Structures are given as structure tokens and as C-alpha cells.
Amino acid sequence: TLKQVEELAMKRPKQALLVLDGAYAEYGDNYDGGIQLVKHKSNVIMTRTFSKIYGLGGMRVGWGFGPKPVIEALQRVRGPFNLSVPALAVAEAAITDQDYIKRCKEENNATRDWFIASLRKLGLACDNSFTNFVLLRFKNKSQAELCDQYLQSKGVIVRRVDGYNLPEALRITVGDRNTCERLVGVIEEFLVRQE
């Protein structure tokens, strides 16, 4: 919660920088990604990316907001040409088309909610999500591994999250409705084969 992040920022030594990763901030309603906290703390910086809702992962474009001394220090250590002209042009075009971003968010949220409900109807556990991915939980690590292997055999790549201490889970990016419908069908096939 924002309150927990504020408490964390208050407890940090002044020389320790708290970096807030706002990669998914645009998916939330009334969430500023930490901007208000950055405005009031000298050791907090917030980063954002064009990789998620803007769909520009390959362009490697992002931005940060923080106290002037922190930004000045970052300016001194960054590479001289860290962004290409095409990447900047694409990012500028993307950020000016907020109507498109609004539609993307609405489509993502509707598809994500349908996807979660469909997976739960299959008897699977899913965490609630406010982003562009779903955390699908299985009974155990073995079942998650078997599902991952089955999905790969069908040309579907998802992300194992063992490294986040979630060996029984798979992280699945929300695609368009047709893709998610296909994926629900493939997961249902897997479950039937497990019986």
C-alpha cells in the first residue's frame, strides 16, 4: 500500500535511495506511482517505462522523477546517447495519444477480468490483478512445471516464477480476447489430461 511505502521511505537513512518502480502505474486507477512521495522526500525516486501499457518494450524508453541532486547524479553517469532518435520519436507519439492508451487499458482490464474468471471456473486459483498479467497458482510445483511444459508444446510461452518464491505459479501476460480464449482452452486440455 502507499502507506507502507511511505513508512519505508521514512525509515530509510537519508543516504539510502528508495527507487519506486512504476512500470504498471498506468494500469491502476488514481495511482500516481509515487509522484507525491517523491515531491516530499529527498531520498526517493520513481521510474516509469514505455514497455508496458505503451507497448514499446523493444524501444527501451523510460523516465524517472526525483529530487534534483539525484537526477543530476544520474545525468553524470548515464551514457551520452542512451536513446536513439527513433525511440524518442515513438515514445513522444505514444504519450500524446492518451485516447489510445485509455482504450488499451479498458480492453486489458476487461480481458484480464474475463481471463481470471475463466481460469477460476476451471478450478484454478488466480490472484487478483491490477496489471497486464495474471498469476495462476497450481496445487504444487510439479503441476506448474507440467502445465508449463504442456503450454510450450502448444506454442504458448508463460513465465515460471520460482525465483520469486512462487514455484507453484505461472505468470501469464494478458493478450487480446482471442488469445486468452485459446489459452483457457489449452489449460483446460492440460487439466483433463491430468485426471
Q: What are these language model-derived features?
A:
Residues L17, A125, I157:
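Residue-level detector of anion-binding/catalytic polar loops
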Residues G58, F130, N165-E168:
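Short acidic/glycine-enriched loop/turn segments that link adjacent beta-strands
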Residues N109, K121-K154, L170:
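Conserved PLP-binding catalytic core of the aspartate aminotransferase-like
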